[in-house]
Amino acid sequence: RFESRGLGDVYKRQLLQTSDRLLMTYQVLARKWRPNTFDEVVGQDYVVKALKGALDLEKLPHAFIFSGTRGTGKTTLARILAKAINCSNSKKKSQPCRKCDSCLSIENGSAIDFQEVDAASRRGVEETKELLDSVPYLPTSSPFKIYLLDEIHMLSKESFNSLLKTLEEPPEHVVFLFATTEIDKVPPTVLSRCVQFNLSAMKVDNIKNQLQLIFDEEKIKYDENSLIKLSSLARGSMRDALTLSEKVISFSEGKITEKKVEELMGLPSSELIQSILKSIIGRDSKKLIELSLIHI
């Protein structure tokens, strides 16, 4: 009995260790499939073309601001831009190599000359001043020191005033990248000192095509209607489409179907909607009431 208990404990421990390794190695789809180069960005052709053109011509302003609804690629584009600016290997400035120390350190979050700040949690003037105190110092190992402030609209009025002084006369070695979902809350004095890029909500077809690519690569089974439904529910956000897909994948048994998506989201089925429309067109009030009661 003692030996069997010991083996059982060993088995349980190995099972837990295996489970922990799986949890550590698994990446959610939105993170795993986040674009790492401009060519991987979907649905923002105008912005990508403008950024690549500025990089290739080596005509870079000292401040950029990316605006748009959630999940459209603001922070992702800012990170790609940061890699392109400081890449040491790429023959073409608009194509970060993803192999040099600068590119790799930005991707893994260890870059010294690239700071990413969540302005929503560090919105106070003292925190902003602390950040700006490092601006005059030259970069350690890269051509530029790059500051990415996400959700910049959350900064306090005092913080914006402090930032404005630096934006008026930025050092040659500094580039600011800002991202916001509410550009109307950013003071005009700050906006006027930035090159602005408004990212549009992604089209359903773009989201659908990207989902199809990802599902095929991930060996996820699906039907065509489920892709259309997921893409429509995402409301222009690729990240939301992938987050929703994760939920449906865990809910589905082997294959994502339109019916599974509707059940998970509490939506009326396509068949029910078609029946209701037919009843309305045919002026069949009795049938319409029956269908309404069934759905309720």
Task: Cite the ranges covered by each PLM segment.
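P-loop/Walker A NTP-binding region and its immediately flanking N-terminal helices
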Residues: 15-196, 206
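Single conserved hydrophobic/aromatic residue that forms the stacking wall/gate
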Residues: 1-14, 294-295
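Extended, largely alpha-helical regulatory/partner-binding modules appended to the mid-to-C-terminal parts
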Residues: 108-112, 127-130, 143, 179, ...
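Hydrophobic side-chain positions on well-ordered alpha-helices
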Residues: 1, 41, 54, 279-282
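A short glycine-leucine-enriched loop at secondary-structure breakpoints
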Residues: 4-8, 187, 266
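Short linear Ser/Thr-Pro motifs
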Residues: 4, 120-121, 237
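Intrinsic disorder/low-complexity detector
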Residues: 11, 20-22, 286
